[in-house]
Amino acid sequence: MEPLTRAQKELFDWLVSYIDETQHAPSIRQMMRAMNLRSPAPIQSRLERLRNKGYVDWTDGKARTLRILHQKPKGVSVIGELKGGELVEADAEEVEKIDFAPLMKKSSVFALRVMSNDLVDDFIVEGDMLILRSVTGEEEIEDGELVAASIKGGKIAIKRYYQDGTKVVLKASNNKGPGQELKASDVEIQGILMGVWRNFQGV
């Protein structure tokens, strides 16, 4: 790609850092503050140059759609797939990357350590770390999702969540019965399960 001027590189490096940390594009005003500029014109000019040189792109007419192009993938390499217990290696030129860093930077993500085998029916065992994200007030929770829930401000427990009209049903993983039916107002969802971290190194 065509090289950048010092001013263009300064803005580009800041954009890469900002988007990597926040997972969304900044506003023009934020770019102005970061570059110590009082007018949007220089920012818009630099952005156009970055776009023409193939470093960034955005959707015209829509705010905060700027994205970085041709960024080198980060994270853990997925070197292949296991089928029937045998490794099928991935194409060396098309190795997928899984980047956990953006997830871990979000303030809405938290972890709970599992200290029993009560969740074994969900393939979660003692020592596992549950990775959850906080729930916003307006968010709809899908039936059957594993959630961290508290009842009337009590202790938090991991349950499967079901909505039944104005009521909520919470079911324990090891309970084959109908579950606990509660008023929705009595249940506070602290988080939704995103994934499970299992460490085989004994750390």
From Swiss-Prot:
GO molecular function: DNA-binding transcription repressor activity; sequence-specific DNA binding; serine-type endopeptidase activity
A Pfam family reported for this protein in Swiss-Prot or TrEMBL: Peptidase_S24
Region (Binds hox promoter DNA): 1-88
Biological process, per Gene Ontology: DNA replication; negative regulation of DNA-templated transcription; positive regulation of DNA-templated transcription; proteolysis; SOS response
GO cellular component terms listed in the entry, alphabetical order: cytoplasm; protein-DNA complex
Subunit structure: Monomer in solution, probably binds DNA as a dimer.
This protein's name: Transcription regulator LexA
Gene from which the chain derives: lexA
